[in-house]
């Protein structure tokens, strides 16, 4: 939308109960329902629908045809009040869908700050997405998935319900995971979702020095290459964690698992 264009296109439909900051822009044929709150500097492109209860922060961009805050796609949902919360600085591309939570799943779907969600991404009910993530085209998160910060998910990849994807992980194109993906881990580009080393390039880009990356590589080899039972691998990781906050975070992620760890 150009600077000289009207802030609210005359074909947009905005419920009187919606609360929009004074500089929010809304494009042609978009619908914003009741109990929607949108912060300053946010742009809603054409043909978007935003349903409440939904809270959206500042400086977000919904490019067009996005469906935000719709009812969860869960047969157990019975109309209870649930919500979607989106942070600041996110870019939501064409035909992205993000659903509200469910009463049985915590009641809230959360998207953090500075994420990029490319065309046809789907974020299901009760998902919790961190900050600085990139979801490529057709990324699919089933219900209750948790995604850490700086995660990159390639096109046509997805995660089974209740899975966790740790910070700085990378899922290759078409990767499907039905288990927890530890932080820093790369998942191969196939439907089996096999681990394929650590995300070294991504870590370098984010300022991890050689010493930190070396400690993470050692932890990965302990977990995936040494052939150890998980219980024994965790004991060795506990020793390594004494000298590395990154390994300590990796071990804490493993200890908190409720689903099987991807191995």
Curated annotation (Swiss-Prot):
InterPro entries reported for this sequence: Acetyltransf_C, Acetyltransf_C_sf, Hexapep, Lipid_A_LpxA, Trimer_LpxA-like_sf
Pathway given in the UniProt record: Glycolipid biosynthesis; lipid IV(A) biosynthesis; lipid IV(A) from (3R)-3-hydroxytetradecanoyl-[acyl-carrier-protein] and UDP-N-acetyl-alpha-D-glucosamine: step 1/6
Reaction it catalyzes: a (3R)-hydroxyacyl-[ACP] + UDP-N-acetyl-alpha-D-glucosamine = a UDP-3-O-[(3R)-3-hydroxyacyl]-N-acetyl-alpha-D-glucosamine + holo-[ACP]
SUPFAM superfamilies for this protein: Trimeric LpxA-like enzymes (SSF51161)
Entry keywords, A to Z: Acyltransferase, Cytoplasm, Lipid A biosynthesis, Lipid biosynthesis, Lipid metabolism, Repeat, Transferase
Matches recorded under CDD domains: LbH_UDP-GlcNAc_AT
GO molecular function (one): acyl-[acyl-carrier-protein]-UDP-N-acetylglucosamine O-acyltransferase activity
EC number: 2.3.1.129
Subcellular localization, as worded in the UniProt entry: Cytoplasm
BP-aspect Gene Ontology terms: lipid A biosynthetic process
EC primary class: transferase
One GO CC term on file: membrane
Family: Belongs to the transferase hexapeptide repeat family. LpxA subfamily.
Assembly and interaction partners: Homotrimer.
Classification via PANTHER family: ACYL-[ACYL-CARRIER-PROTEIN]--UDP-N-ACETYLGLUCOSAMINE O-ACYLTRANSFERASE, ACYL-[ACYL-CARRIER-PROTEIN]--UDP-N-ACETYLGLUCOSAMINE O-ACYLTRANSFERASE, MITOCHONDRIAL-RELATED
Job of this protein: Involved in the biosynthesis of lipid A, a phosphorylated glycolipid that anchors the lipopolysaccharide to the outer membrane of the cell.
HAMAP family: LpxA
Name of this chain's protein: Acyl-[acyl-carrier-protein]--UDP-N-acetylglucosamine O-acyltransferase
Phylogenetic lineage: Bacteria, Pseudomonadati, Pseudomonadota, Gammaproteobacteria, Lysobacterales
Gene giving rise to this polypeptide: lpxA
């Amino acid at each position: 939308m150009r600077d000289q264009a009207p802030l609210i296109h005359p074909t947009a439909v905005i419920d009187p109960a919606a609360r929009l900051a004074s500089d929010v822009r809304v494009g042609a044929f978009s619908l914003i329902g009741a109990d929607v709150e949108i912060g300053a500097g946010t742009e809603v492109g054409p043909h978007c629908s935003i349903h409440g209860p939904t809270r959206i922060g500042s400086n977000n961009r919904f490019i067009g045809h996005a469906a935000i805050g719709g009812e969860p796609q869960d047969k157990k949902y019975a109309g209870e009040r649930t919500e979607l919360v989106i942070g600041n600085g996110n870019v939501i591309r064409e035909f992205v869908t993000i659903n509200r939570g469910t009463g049985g799943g915590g009641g809230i779907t959360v998207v953090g700050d500075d994420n990029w969600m490319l065309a046809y991404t789907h974020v299901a009910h009760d998902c919790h997405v961190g900050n600085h993530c990139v979801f490529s085209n057709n990324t699919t998160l089933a219900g209750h998935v948790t995604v850490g910060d700086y995660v990159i998910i390639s096109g046509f990849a997805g995660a089974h319900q209740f899975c966790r994807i740790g910070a700085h992980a990378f899922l290759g194109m078409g990767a499907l995971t039905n288990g927890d993906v530890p932080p820093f881990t790369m998942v191969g580009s196939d439907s089996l979702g096999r681990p394929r080393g650590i995300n070294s390039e991504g870590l370098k880009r984010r300022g991890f020095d050689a010493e930190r990356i070396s400690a993470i590589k050692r932890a990965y080899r302990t977990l995936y290459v040494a052939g150890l039972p998980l219980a024994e691998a965790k004991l060795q990781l506990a020793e390594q964690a004494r000298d590395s906050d990154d390994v300590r975070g990796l071990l804490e992620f493993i200890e908190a698992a409720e689903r099987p760890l991807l191995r």
